[in-house]
Amino acid sequence: MAARKNQKSPKPKVASSKLKNIKKSSKRNNSQSSTEPRKNATSLDSKKTTKKGVALPEIAERELTQEDIEFFNENPSSLKYLSSINPEDLGKKVEKGPRPDIYDLKKSQQFELDTSRLSSDEESVLDYSKDSEDEQDYELRPRVSSSWNNESYNRLPIKTKDGLLQNVVADVNNGEEFLSESESEASLEIDSDIKDEKQKSLEEQKIAPEIPVKQQIKNDKEALGIQAQQLLEEPVENLHLIRNIFEKFDSPYITIKKLSLLTLLAVFRDIIPGYKIRPLSEEEQGTKLSKEVAQRWEYEQTLLKHYAKFLQTLETILKSFSSTLDETQLSLYQVAVRCCTKLIEQASHFNLSEKLFALAVRQISHKTKRPGFDGIINSLKNIFEEDNLGKTSLKCVTILSRMFKQRNYDVLPDVYDLFLSVNILNDMKIKDEAWQDDTTNFKKRKKDLPYLTKKARKNYKETKKITQEMKEADAVITAQDKEKYQSEILKIIFITYFKTLQLKGKLIGNALEGVARLSHLLNIEFLGDLLQVLRELVMDDTVFLPKDKSGVQATREALLTVSTAFEIASAQGVGKLNLDLDLGLFVQRLYKIIFPFSLNPDADLNLKIKRLKDPDAPSKPFVVNATTEMEMLLKCFQVFFFKSKNISSSRLSSFSKRLAIASMQLPEHSASADLALLKKLLSRYSKLSRLLTSEEQIGDGIYNPFIEDPDLSNSSTAVLYEPFLLKNHYSPAVSQSAKELLKSTSL
């Protein structure tokens, strides 16, 4: 080992001599850098002067074409750069510049490092660890790649005077920060995250204005259609798509809001089951259910939640109505009303039906008609008319009566007359299907019947008997339920009518319309109270003459009062009760209104008859009862003269004379009906025939046709000369009726 250490190879000598020369040259360069130029630089300068230029290639000249000449004429400025080019500079050889000092230093350090590895017996002169720790300036700079900069600094191109487009690049001064390596990496990561977030926010902001409104509406419309189609095809699997439709309602565009509401309406109308969803009890929730039952229960509960949210959305829109809404907001309100009406017609059996009815009733409870008023009225009428059982009608009637009470019975007549559309007048008819089956089987021929063995006939009879018993049980249950619901409906309706009659408001005529139609269904125990209320109305002469009505219009309400009282008095079982049935006030009222009634030109017309409207006639409210005033008058006379007994002769003659006078003023059809009634009275009561003779009769005085009491008019001295005048009436029907009247009395 010692000999090997003392032995010196030629390579280390060469290396050591080279190291010494490098050290000397480096010291010499450091000492003379400020005063003398380097030898390498001087040698390069001397070489530049001695080197020759590169020979330019010879290119054959080419003649200019017509296209080249036109191009140069159009763009004269594009060849200006040729004048600034020196042909000699083009032939110069491109040479590299002087290398930086740091390059020689690093190269020498690398060479010394290699030599130190070769010779292990020589000590290192330079401290490489110290040099490696001292970082250079370029190493301290942050290593930023140009690809990290996501922002674009290009500006819009400009157009020069020559008509060319020139791109403009903005000057961006990126400050160089001197950070440590760890801090620079952290700052770069933070900056990149911030830039990514800013870029995402900018992209989100740019998305909205980039898409036009029409295109956005079209896209949303297509998306809503696709989602609705998927829901209708597979409602159980795609029920989650309803949330996406609800999200479209949050759009700032009214059109998309309306489309989302209509889409939800179509979906719910199709997927709502025909039964009411029953919530599970606590015991059922605790028990373990099968997979199919649990899936079905989850579907039903989710559907019910979405339906409740839809009704809540409609309620919010309907509550936001005001007279200051613009056309777009008003259109959204109308769409909400339409959704409400459609759900009433097709989802009244489903859950939350009370809330749905409350929404509809709230929109028609105001003193003025809002948009969609007629649609809600028609939908509620359809519910009342089509509900045979009465369960749904009971819910709606209860909500309506509560609203009437809150409004102090001051609502529109159309709303109040909804009670007249309730289907409680038709008796339930239970068909004996078993009897029909027996009849049809009896009519069949024996050869057409299939052959059955003795055992098969026995089984057939047993099955038939069980089926018949089940049908009878179902029919009894249905009949009991219907009777229960209809009794509750009648009770609520009559209480509403009584309250209206007691208040003597503007809806008294509508209440009388309802009482007259439903009086035959009223319980006998309430007849006395109803007669007392009607008697109070008859005694008050001003109750039928509000400010907006004339005396001619008040005759209808008076006739309704009298006809209702007469119908109650003639009902079955009333005679067995100890009721005060004195109808004297009603008789006087009937006698009093005959003359005002004869002045009504529309006495024989109803709303179903088409006619031109009189522009000078006072406005009339809508009447649900299509009965004409002449029909009501004939009904009163029918009850008073032909169903009652012990009528005084003075009343008979007074009413007959007043009817004859009224026939001179009545319209054509009413005059014919009046003469027919007189003919019937004269044939029933023969003592009235003396009114057609001119012989002198003993009486208490002269006949006074203007006294309102029929017993004090001295009608026994009156003469019926009106039929003789009506023989020459312009109407052939009236003339023929008068001739038949006189012929029946042999005059």
Swiss-Prot record:
Domain of life of the source: Eukaryota
Residue ranges of coiled coil: 214-234
Composition-biased stretches (Basic residues): 1-11
GO molecular function, one term: chromatin binding
Region (Disordered): 1-142
Disulphide connectivity of cysteines: none
Biased composition regions of type Polar residues, renumbered to the chain: 74-86
UniProt KW Nucleus keyword: yes
Compartments reported by the entry: Nucleus, Nucleolus
Keyword entries, A-Z: Coiled coil, Nucleus, Phosphoprotein, Ribosome biogenesis
Biased composition (Basic and acidic residues): 89-109
Entry-linked Pfam families: CBF, NOC3p
GO cellular component labels: Noc2p-Noc3p complex; nucleolus; nucleus
InterPro entries documented for this protein: CCAAT-binding_factor (IPR005612), Noc3_N (IPR011501), Nucleolar_cplx-assoc_3 (IPR016903)
Gene Ontology biological-process annotations: DNA replication initiation; rRNA processing
UniProt keyword annotation of Cell cycle present: no
Function field: May be required for synthesis of 60S ribosomal subunits and the transport of pre-ribosomes from the nucleoplasm to the cytoplasm.
Family stated for the protein in its record: Belongs to the CBF/MAK21 family.
Name of the protein in question: Nucleolar complex-associated protein 3
Species, as recorded: Schizosaccharomyces pombe (strain 972 / ATCC 24843)
Lineage: Eukaryota, Fungi, Dikarya, Ascomycota, Taphrinomycotina
